[in-house]
């Protein structure tokens, strides 16, 4: 089962992605994690990428395509890609790669929230510096303040989580999504999920859909 998951800043897509990979044993390919790992290398490319991220801008398509598709080459089935593709050009690059390797996307989940909700959520968001686990000081705090429940790493606020940058990132996301939605609707795999509400509430909107797709794919395998 190969899945794409989208959502504006603060939509909870990374939180729900982690639930999905645990429940269905999928490989997690997160564009944000890949970008941060490259930035942390401190090389020329990483420094240039950091400039885009600090302003809330998207990376050039050629850069993010290379990074994500290089990661995807290591795991070509049973994956979830978080936060990619983000532009029409990225869709084209991804779909060409998938076609060349005989891979199909089974589900494209778009978790939608309003700009106001996005800014509210992001202002309280905290990220584990080591493993990337996501917390929120109000809705989903770590058990020990400043310490990750999963790996014990330091939990921090990201530099690009200010209201001004979040607002810009939200607008860029919405403005770029139309051709992506159109394409995956045409493929019959696009589903928009109402992302407002608590984590469990939103999860219960996602889970039945995933169970259906998972069971359908398992039945197909039995007859192959």
Curated annotation (Swiss-Prot):
Cell compartment(s), UniProt: Cytoplasm
Domain of life: Archaea
Pathway annotation: Purine metabolism; AMP biosynthesis via salvage pathway; AMP from ADP: step 1/1
Keywords for this protein: ATP-binding, Cytoplasm, Kinase, Metal-binding, Nucleotide biosynthesis, Nucleotide-binding, Transferase, Zinc
Record Pfam families: ADK (PF00406), ADK_lid (PF05191)
Binding residues annotated for ATP, in chain numbering: 10-15, 125, 134-135, 197
Catalytic activity as recorded in UniProt: AMP + ATP = 2 ADP
Name the UniProt record assigns to this protein: Adenylate kinase
UniProt source species: Thermococcus sibiricus (strain DSM 12597 / MM 739)
Organismal lineage: Archaea, Methanobacteriati, Methanobacteriota, Thermococci, Thermococcales
Gene name in the database record: adk
């Amino acid at each position: 089962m190969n899945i794409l998951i989208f959502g504006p800043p603060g939509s909870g897509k990374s939180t729900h992605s982690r639930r999905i990979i645990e429940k269905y044993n999928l490989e997690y390919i997160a564009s944000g994690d890949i970008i941060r790992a490259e930035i942390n290398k401190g090389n020329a490319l990483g420094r240039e990428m950091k400039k885009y991220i600090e302003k809330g801008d998207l990376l050039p398509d050629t850069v993010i395509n290379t990074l994500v598709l290089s990661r995807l080459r290591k795991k070509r089935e049973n994956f979830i890609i978080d936060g990619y593709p983000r532009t029409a050009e990225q869709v084209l690059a991804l779909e060409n790669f998938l076609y060349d390797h005989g891979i199909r996307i089974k589900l494209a989940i778009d978790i939608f929230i309003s700009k106001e909700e996005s800014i509210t959520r992001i202002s309280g968001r905290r990220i584990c510096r080591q493993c990337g686990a996501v917390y929120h000081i109000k809705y989903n705090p770590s058990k020990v303040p400043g310490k990750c429940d999963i790996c014990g790493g330091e939990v921090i606020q990201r530099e690009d989580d200010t209201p001004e940058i979040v607002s810009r990132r939200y607008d860029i996301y919405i403005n770029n999504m139309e051709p992506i939605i159109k394409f995956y609707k045409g493929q019959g795999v696009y589903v928009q999920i109402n992302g407002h509400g608590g984590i469990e509430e939103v999860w219960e909107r996602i889970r039945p859909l995933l169970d259906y797709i998972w069971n359908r794919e398992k039945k197909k395998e039995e007859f192959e």
